[in-house]
């Protein structure tokens, strides 16, 4: 009986730990997706494209699974919080205030919810992105 109980307990522990490995892997890949979208946004330097890249990064990360969606939310929220702080010191350089931050968060949520990020894609943005 003790052997049976031990085997059940070990299988439960291993099952839970494998879920954590999956979550962590998804989170790392999701963070990479967010970085890639940010890097593409900086490279493209295309007017009115930031909402598209916000939505795309969140969409790509969320497609990884719960870990990717979690990473996308954490990174997006941290980015918007830091933007609000920098706006206090240098308005306009890091965004356009509260309205822009709310629009960014809406684009983030749009992407995380699985909706098509191309909804925010500006016309004329090169196909590379």
Swiss-Prot record:
**Which Pfam families does this UniProt record tie to the protein?**
SAA (PF00277)
Keywords, A to Z? Answer: Acute phase, Amyloid, HDL, Pyrrolidone carboxylic acid, Secreted, Signal
Question: Which superkingdom heads the taxonomic lineage of this protein's source?
Answer: Eukaryota
Gene3D superfamilies reported in the protein's UniProt record: Serum amyloid A protein
Matches recorded under SMART domains = SAA
Report the GO terms under cellular component: high-density lipoprotein particle
- Modified residue Pyrrolidone carboxylic acid is at which positions? 19
* GO biological process, any: acute-phase response
Localisation: Secreted
User: What biological function has been recorded for the protein in this entry?
Assistant: Major acute phase reactant.
Name listed for the protein in its UniProt record: Serum amyloid A-2 protein
What organism does this protein naturally occur in? Neovison vison (American mink)
Gene (UniProt): SAA2P0DJI9
């Amino acid at each position: 009986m003790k052997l049976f109980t031990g085997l059940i307990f070990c299988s439960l522990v291993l099952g839970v730990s494998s879920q954590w490995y999956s979550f962590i892997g998804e989170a790392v890949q999701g963070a990479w997706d967010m970085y890639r979208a940010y890097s593409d946004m900086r490279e493209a330097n295309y007017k009115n494209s930031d909402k598209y890249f916000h939505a795309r990064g969140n969409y790509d990360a969320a497609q990884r699974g719960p870990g990717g969606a979690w990473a996308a939310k954490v990174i997006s929220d941290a980015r918007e919080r830091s933007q609000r702080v920098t706006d206090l010191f240098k308005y306009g350089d890091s965004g356009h205030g509260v309205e822009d931050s709310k629009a960014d968060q809406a684009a983030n949520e749009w992407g995380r919810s699985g909706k098509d990020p191309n909804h925010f894609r500006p016309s004329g943005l090169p196909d590379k992105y």
